[in-house]
Amino acid sequence: MTITPQNLIALLPLLIVGLTVVVVMLSIAWRRNHFLNATLSVIGLNAALVSLWFVGQAGAMDVTPLMRVDGFAMLYTGLVLLASLATCTFAYPWLEGYNDNKDEFYLLVLIAALGGILLANANHLASLFLGIELISLPLFGLVGYAFRQKRSLEASIKYTILSAAASSFLLFGMALVYAQSGDLSFVALGKNLGDGMLNEPLLLAGFGLMIVGLGFKLSLVPFHLWTPDVYQGAPAPVSTFLATASKIAIFGVVMRLFLYAPVGDSEAIRVVLAIIAFASIIFGNLMALSQTNIKRLLGYSSISHLGYLLVALIALQTGEMSMEAVGVYLVGYLFSSLGAFGVVSLMSSPYRGPDADSLFSYRGLFWHRPILAAVMTVMMLSLAGIPMTLGFIGKFYVLAVGVQAHLWWLVGAVVVGSAIGLYYYLRVAVSLYLHAPEQPGRDAPSNWQYSAGGIVVLISALLVLVLGVWPQPLISIVRLAMPLM
C-alpha cells in the first residue's frame, strides 16, 4: 500500500498532534518550563484544528484499511481538539500552584487527544480498540495527578482497575465477532452480517461483551459505578476532559459502527440498549438529586446525558435525523460541560486544598463575581434543556427522533428525566444568588475574565446562548458531517 500526499493531508490533525507530543517531550527533556510547554501544547492543538480546513478540501477517503477520513470524522476530531484545548487552558492556572512536575500533564492530554482523533477516524475494530486504549491510558495518570490528595489517588486506582476489566470484555467481544464474521472492518461486518446472521449466539455474545466494554467507557448504567468517584477525585481540568473529549470520541466511533454494521437490526441488541438507555436516564437523574458536590452532580448528570444520546443511537435505523440529533446534542453538551467545569477550575487550585466542588463554595457567588455566576447559570440551564439555550435544541432533537422511531417508553423517560434534572440544575443556579456567607470559602481571581481559561468559559457561554437562539449554522455543519456510505 502506498501513502500519497492526499493521504497525508487527510491525516494532518493526527500527524500534527503526534508531532506536538514529540516536541513537548523533547522540550521537557531539555528544560522544564511550564509556560513554554503549555504554549507549545496549545499551539499544536490550534494548528491541528486549523488543518481540518485542508482535510475538508481533500475530500472523503479511506486512508488505510483502519481509518476513514470524511465529514463525520472531521466533526468529531474538531470536538475532541476543542475539548483538549479547553483542558490545557484550564490546567495552566490550576497547575501554577502545583508543587510537583507540571509539564507531563500537557503530554498526557496530547496523547489522549491523539487517541480521540484516532477514534473519530476509526473504520475497523482494531483501530477502535487502539483509540480507546490510547485515550484511556493517559487518563490513568491524569486522574491521579493530584496524588497527594487521597481522593485523587483513590480515583486513579479505581479507574485503572475497572478500565482494564472493561477493555478485556471489549477485546473478548471483538474476538467472538471475528470468529463468526471473519472480518474486523466496519464495512465488511455490514456485508457479512446478512439476513439471520445477527441471531447467531456467538455473534450476540460478542456484541454483548462489546456493549459491556463500551458501556463502561461511556459510563452507562449498570457500568457507571466509577463515574461519580472519579469525577470527584480527578483534578477539575481532568474531569473536563473525561466528561467531554473521552465521551464524544467513543460515542462517535460507536455511532459509525452502528451505521456500517447493522447491529441495531437485532431485536435482542435493541432491547438491551433500550433498557440501558432507560436505566441511565432515570438512575443518573435520580442519583444527582441528592448530591451536594458539583463534580459528583455533573458526573451523575453525564450518565443521563449519555442515556439521551443512546435514544438517538437506537433510532439510527429509522433515518438520518438521528445522526443530526447526536451531532447537535454533543456540541451542546460539549460547550455546556466546558463552561460548568471551567467555572469549577477557575475557583480551584491544588495549593488551596481540594477543588472548589462543594455546592456551599458557590453560595452567593453572584454578589462578588456576577459575570462568573451568570456563566454558571447559563450552563446549568443549557444542561437542563431550557429554551433559548443550545441544550434545549439538542434535547428537542432527541425527543423528535424518539417520536419518529416510535420509542414511546424512551421518549417518556427523556421527559421524566428532564423534569428531574430541572430540579438539581436549578438548585445549583439558585445557590449562586443566595445571601453570601460572611466568610466566602473559595473565590476565583479578580481578573479571571482576562485569563485564557476565563475567555474559554465566556466563549462557551456565548455559543450556548447564540446557537440556542439561532441554531441554523450548527445544524448546517452537522449535516455536512454525515458520513457517506
Curated annotation (Swiss-Prot):
Pfam assignment, any one: Proton_antipo_M
GO molecular function: NADH dehydrogenase (ubiquinone) activity; NADH:ubiquinone reductase (non-electrogenic) activity; quinone binding
Protein's cellular compartments: Cell inner membrane
Membrane topology: Multi-pass membrane protein
Keywords assigned by UniProt, alphabetized: Cell inner membrane, Cell membrane, Membrane, NAD, Quinone, Translocase, Transmembrane, Transmembrane helix, Transport, Ubiquinone
Catalytic activity: a quinone + NADH + 5 H(+)(in) = a quinol + NAD(+) + 4 H(+)(out)
Enzyme class (EC, first level): translocase
Main location: membrane
SS bonds (residue pairs): none
GO cellular component: plasma membrane
A GO biological process held by the record: ATP synthesis coupled electron transport
Regions that span the bilayer: 8-28, 35-55, 71-91, 105-125, 127-147, 159-179, 203-223, 235-255, 271-291, 297-317, 326-346, 373-393, 408-430, 455-475
EC number: 7.1.1.-
HAMAP family in UniProt: NDH1_NuoN_1
Quaternary structure, from the entry: NDH-1 is composed of 13 different subunits. Subunits NuoA, H, J, K, L, M, N constitute the membrane sector of the complex.
Function: NDH-1 shuttles electrons from NADH, via FMN and iron-sulfur (Fe-S) centers, to quinones in the respiratory chain. The immediate electron acceptor for the enzyme in this species is believed to be ubiquinone. Couples the redox reaction to proton translocation (for every two electrons transferred, four hydrogen ions are translocated across the cytoplasmic membrane), and thus conserves the redox energy in a proton gradient.
Family that this chain belongs to: Belongs to the complex I subunit 2 family.
Protein name (record): NADH-quinone oxidoreductase subunit N
Natural source organism: Escherichia coli O1:K1 / APEC
